[in-house]
From Swiss-Prot:
Pfam families: UPF0102. It comes from Prosthecochloris aestuarii (strain DSM 271 / SK 413). Gene3D superfamilies: 3.40.1350.10. Belongs to the UPF0102 family. GO terms for molecular function: nucleic acid binding. It comes from the Bacteria. This is UPF0102 protein Paes_0016. CDD domains: PoNe_Nuclease. SUPFAM superfamilies: Restriction endonuclease-like.
Length: 127
């Protein structure tokens, strides 16, 4: 059984958040929206604030999930991160942009059960 893209994406974000928690990250916010853009996960890794984009794919037949984080998408994430920092986080802090790729390997009763995770820290930088 396959999932519709929205469900797959949501479950991929849940899997990424759980994976980050297991790695010692502290989740600050999920699905932070600014205007029409969104950051999937905002988390602390020790003393670094991480803005995490999650891309989930059922297969890699049409490309690896990391390929979907285009330069345009990076600009949108950076703009949204700046808005978050200005409006909601009023102290100086080290920041970085990460990408988590989730590739589905198995489903059970419509739920993502098996998957591969690839986490790229410092995947891109704000200029």
């Amino acid at each position: 059984m396959s999932l519709i893209p929205h469900d797959l994406g949501r479950q991929g974000e849940d899997a990424a958040a759980s994976w980050l928690l297991c790695k010692g990250y502290r989740i600050i916010r999920r699905n932070y929206r600014y205007r029409r853009n969104e950051i999937d996960i905002i988390a602390m890794d020790d003393r670094t604030l991480c803005f995490v984009e999650v891309k989930t794919r059922a297969t890699i037949d049409k490309g690896h999930p990391l390929e979907a984080v285009t330069p345009q998408k990076q600009k949108e994430i950076i703009r949204t991160a700046r808005a978050f920092l200005c409006m909601e986080y009023h102290e100086e802090i080290d920041c970085r942009f990460d990408v988590v790729a989730i590739i589905a390997k198995g489903y059970e009763k419509g739920r993502l059960k098996e998957f591969d995770v690839e986490h790229i820290t410092d995947a891109f930088w704000a200029e």
